[in-house]
Amino acid sequence: MASTLPARGLAAVMLAALAAGCTTIAQRPEPAPAPRFSALDVERYGAVAGEPFHVPAVSLEDLRPRNLRQLVEYGTREAPGTIVVDPKHRFLYLVQEGGKALRYGVGVGREGLAWSGSANVATKRAWPNWTPTPDMIRREPGKYAKWAGGMSGGADNPLGARALYLFKDGRDTLYRIHGTNEPETIGHAVSSGCIRMMNQDVIDLYRRVSAGAKVVVLPG
């Protein structure tokens, strides 16, 4: 009898070890990655209703999050309501109270680097007409010569849904802040045009800015 006790004890220990080996420890699931774009971003860049021409939703996956409209810290001596264009970093700022600004991503064309300084918004136009410059026609006649007489406003117009026209001392600077039907170009240098914004953004800026507003264009 005494000789069997160690064997029984050993068997019990082995059974306990086997049972422990079959026990699974519950693993906490990995948290889902945060979405690249918020619900607010999706809403802001959705299709725009109430316009005379179709403004489609922007495919956010084609954009970098930094180029979406957002409130940022912005130290400047310019008064609230001033537009500051930074062609080098491809941002446009609308100065707000409290050291902040609304920042919009922009695309910068060749004409957008041709002038810097301060001016004012002389005219605001919804769905503006567009005429290519003589330089644009010379560079790409096959693309622009047919529009030498101008193109009416519409979904295919390169100026997009809105345009702000900058004048200095009563004279046209030929500098424009406008929409685009090519939102994928935002954040990039482009061959032609001045400062282009997504149509959703230029519509937002248009609502916030009055004629006469100061605009500062930094050197590119």
PLM segments and residue spans:
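N-terminal pre-domains immediately preceding structured catalytic cores
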Residues: A2-L5, G9-G220
